[in-house]
Amino acid sequence: MTVVPVTSADLDAAEVSWFSALCSDDYAYLGVPDGSLRSSFEHCSDIVKKAEELGFRNILCPSSYQVGQDTLSFVAGCAPISDRINFLAAIRCGEMQPIMLARTVATLDHMLKGRLTLNVISSDFPGEVADSAFRYKRSHEVVEILRQAWTRDTIDHDGEIYQFKGVSTEPARPYQLNGGPLLYFGGYSPDALELCGAQCDVYLMWPETKDQLADRMRAAHERAAAHGRTLDYGLRVHMVVRDTEQEAREYADHLVSKLDDEYGQLIRNRAHDSGSLGVSHQARARELADKFGYVEPNLWTGIGRARSGCGAALVGSTDQVLSALEEYQKMGIRAFILSGYPHLDEAEHFGTKVLPQMKTCSLPHAYGRVPSETPATPLGNGERH
């Protein structure tokens, strides 16, 4: 039985996703920059192509002001070089005027023929620090405007930050039906949980102990239930999977064998989410870990020494990692966003050892969002005015 009621209660599969390192986050040794792994379009798109080839169903494309790829530009560039994998594009609310963002999303959704999902983020913009309550209020309004653009004939919004009346939604109609692209969201503060509970579809969590994850799920469900809604749940976690546990643990140690902790701190501080509540929870997990960095069997926190955000990895044999993922599924987790270093190599390890043993799905298809043929939208097969 799941920890809390979930939207896709009858779904017997999981959306298994990989990660494209758009934000200067690919290493052979954590904290040791390698020019061959820089976040160029060529390298990041190679990760996308490898993930699609291996059978991953979605790929997270993050957003940060770092040397690398602009998220939406990158996703657009990948549209013609992919045909099966979905894209989970991060959108930092407030970067773009909301109605123009809705139009941009609609363009991408048509380019990808419904293979678009969105990761709603609310972190600071480069060079400025905004009050958390304001950032989440802004995100709440942006998401509300997006949802109107995708489901109504006009946008009518009278908020504290944005005001629009009677704006036609024709230019912003997405390829996907029944609500538009799915919204994935992660956050731990009361304002974050309220936004997710009221507006989003999938609540994303970073790796902690199973008891802590269950508490996160209960907190998110409480806010969703207050709005008469349910959520699906996702876990973002790194991977180190090998034929044996010993090999996996040795490789985990190898990853951090050249790490200078001061430089690791510098890397963490570069990220826009470095001061967030979620990041503090990841730091706490490192403090509670044993002398080898494990906070729970096979859950290793060493990644977080040189990375903000998601700071732990499942480390183990094929069977151990598969069993851990199955336990998460029993809790009610329906989406896994995975990564590993270097991203091409670890995708191959997971994609050949574990992924073939999992029943996977595309959540937009499971939700009935993706039409079987080009929809009657203004940008699709609808009447042109």
Curated annotation (Swiss-Prot):
EC number(s) given by UniProt: 1.14.14.181
Q: Reaction(s) catalyzed by this protein?
A: 6-sulfo-D-quinovose + FMNH2 + O2 = 6-dehydro-D-glucose + FMN + sulfite + H2O + 2 H(+)
Q: Report TM segments.
A: none
| Listed CDD domains | Alkanesulfonate_monoxygenase
- What keywords appear on the UniProt entry? Carbohydrate metabolism, Flavoprotein, FMN, Monooxygenase, Oxidoreductase
- What does it do? Part of the sulfoquinovose monooxygenase (sulfo-SMO) pathway, a D-sulfoquinovose degradation pathway that enables the complete utilization of all carbons within sulfoquinovose (SQ) with concomitant production of inorganic sulfite. Catalyzes the oxidative desulfurization of sulfoquinovose to sulfite and 6-dehydro-D-glucose. Is highly specific for sulfoquinovose and cannot use sulfoquinovosyl glycerol. FMNH(2) is provided by the FMN reductase SmoA.
Q: What is this protein called?
A: Sulfoquinovose monooxygenase
Question: Source species, please?
Answer: Agrobacterium fabrum (strain C58 / ATCC 33970) (Agrobacterium tumefaciens (strain C58))
Q: What is the gene called?
A: smoC
